[in-house]
Regions:
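Glycine- and acidic
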Residues: 22-27, 173-178, 397, 424-429
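Short histidine-centered catalytic/ligand-binding loop motif
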Residues: 177-181, 230, 377, 381
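C-terminal accessory/binding modules appended to enzymatic or scaffolding proteins
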Residues: 362-422
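N-terminal Rossmann-like or analogous alpha/beta NTP/dinucleotide-binding catalytic cores
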Residues: 1-101, 186-200
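Residue-level signal for inorganic ion chemistry
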Residues: 10, 41, 77, 81, ...
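Short, conserved loop/turn and helix-capping segments at secondary-structure boundaries
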Residues: 4, 35, 181-188, 222-225, ...
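Catalytic adenosine-cofactor/nucleotide-binding cores of aminoacyl-tRNA synthetases and other
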Residues: 31, 198-357, 419-451
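Active-site cores that bind ATP or allylic diphosphates and position pyrophosphate for catalysis
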Residues: 76-79, 84-207, 212-219, 227, ...
Length: 451
């Protein structure tokens, strides 16, 4: 989720400035490099509107393709005196730190004059003084260079470390703005030193707040539901997801948070992003999604629901789905659902071959002594009544008034008989759509079951 929001920040910045959003896959860690993961990133970006075919989009580029440039940059830093080689092993570094009572690398090889060789890492010579990072979100942030150890650029086997590769790629690709999560802020002074040492002006930095869960802990892949596809598969629309993500740490102008992307893209400013961590509230996301579903035209809503009603997400074979029937019930459920995944269970009684009855609901609905005889009375009058929801409701109201049973109670056995459950779309509209023959058949089956 945090990555998706940060991607949106970058995308909007590119749109506002007529710039380029660059997708770079940092694939130098082979243990975390799988082709399907790259495609998953591309698909997730496309779902939230960051389209690879848009002229403001470039990539994906793969960091591993630029390894030679990374090594060349490291060698130039050595040649200019900004870096030096060190032959200490990690164990030796730890032993020296323990003996000195100070954590980290102590700069032991700074003035030893070592050259490249097997097992020798190249380290950056951190200058004295302070490094100032001017951040679009956090303002001026100062770092005492004395707290930053001489960090590695090349490992002992000659491969580049990520922090060097990242800066070299940014320079090569003419990156002007780096917008990322605040957890990367501690690395920023190191990267800014590298930009300076390589003779280039650092980009505009912007470190945005992290997203947290209900316990106010940073969202975690291990603990929290954080993948976009999980929400997509539950029936969150991309428009609602984008709108909600953009309200986490930033607020649109006006008195409502429900705003379209065009408005967001026009009004968003990095300088207006909040410093505090933002709570990713799943319930609020669902509420946003419900608002977006209600804003759809009927045809848009039906089209959005169809994948859920004609695939294995449905509770019936695809061939039993009838778009015309769903078009009739859709206005009655559009205002009642927050997620598209809720739709199949609300309309299954219209499409299943064998209606499943909620046993607990059935027992409760038929517990009253009047339930069976009054349902029989309804069934008798339904055989000749006009088959529309007004006439059907009038029949039930008349029977209820004659027997001193309120409409709400009298609907219970009828609803369970017709739909199999105690809740659902408006009952009389549902009966009208279900049809006389099927409704009477289900009432007969319920009466037989009730005994």
């Amino acid at each position: 989720m945090g990555g998706a929001r940060t991607a949106l920040y970058n995308w909007i910045l590119a749109l506002q400035s007529n710039g380029i959003f660059v997708l770079r896959i940092e694939d130098t860690d082979e243990s975390r490099n799988e082709p399907q993961w790259t495609q998953g990133i591309i698909d997730a970006l496309a779902w939230i509107g960051i389209d690879g075919s848009d002229p403001h989009f470039e990539g994906p580029y793969f960091q591993s393709a630029y390894a030679a440039a990374h090594v060349a940059a490291a060698e130039s830093l050595f040649a200019s005196g900004h870096a030096y080689y060190c032959d200490l092993t990690s164990e030796q570094i730890q032993e020296r730190a323990k003996a000195a009572g100070k954590p980290g690398y102590d700069g032991y090889s700074r003035d030893r004059g070592l050259t490249a060789g097997p097992g020798r890492a190249l380290r950056f010579r951190v200058p004295p003084g302070t490094t100032v990072v001017n951040d679009e979100v956090r303002g001026r942030v100062e770092f005492d260079n004395a707290t930053i150890e001489d960090f590695a650029l090349l490992r002992g086997n000659g491969t580049p470390v990520f922090i060097l590769a990242n800066v070299v790629d940014d320079i090569t690709m003419n990156i002007t703005h780096v917008v990322r999560a605040e957890e990367h802020l501690p690395n920023t002074p190191k990267q800014q030193m590298l930009w300076d040492a390589l003779g280039h002006t650092a980009p505009v930095w912007a470190h945005v707040p992290v997203l947290v869960n209900e316990q106010r802990k940073k969202l975690s892949k291990r603990r929290d539901k954080v993948a976009l596809e999980q929400y997509r598969d539950e029936g969150v629309t991309p428009e609602a997801m984008v709108n909600y993500l953009m309200t986490l740490g930033w607020a649109p102008t006006g008195d409502t948070e429900i705003v379209d992307f065009a408005t967001i893209a026009k009004d968003f400013r990095l300088s207006s992003v909040n410093h505090s961590s933002a709570f990713f509230d799943i319930k609020k996301l669902s509420a946003f999604n419900g608002e977006y579903l209600r804003k759809m035209t009927l045809e848009q809503f039906v089209s959005a629901c169809e994948p859920w009603l004609t695939s294995d997400k449905a509770l019936w074979p695809a061939e039993r789905f009838d778009r015309g029937i769903f078009l009739r019930i859709a206005p009655h459920i559009q205002t009642r659902v927050a997620l598209l995944s809720e739709v199949p269970a609300m309309v299954d009684f219209l499409f299943v071959a064998d209606l499943a009855i909620d046993a607990a609901a059935f027992e409760k609905a038929f517990a009253a002594e009047w339930a069976r005889p009054l349902l029989r009375a309804m069934r008798e009058q339904f055989t000749t009544a006009d088959w529309n929801h007004e006439a059907l409701k009038a029949v039930v109201e008349t029977i209820g008034a004659a027997n001193d049973v309120k409409l709400g109670k009298l609907q219970a056995p009828l609803r369970v008989a017709a739909t199999g459950r105690s809740v659902g779309p408006p009952l009389f509209e549902s009966l009208e759509i279900l049809g006389r023959d099927e409704s009477l058949r289900r009432i007969d089956a319920a009466l037989l079951r009730a005994g």
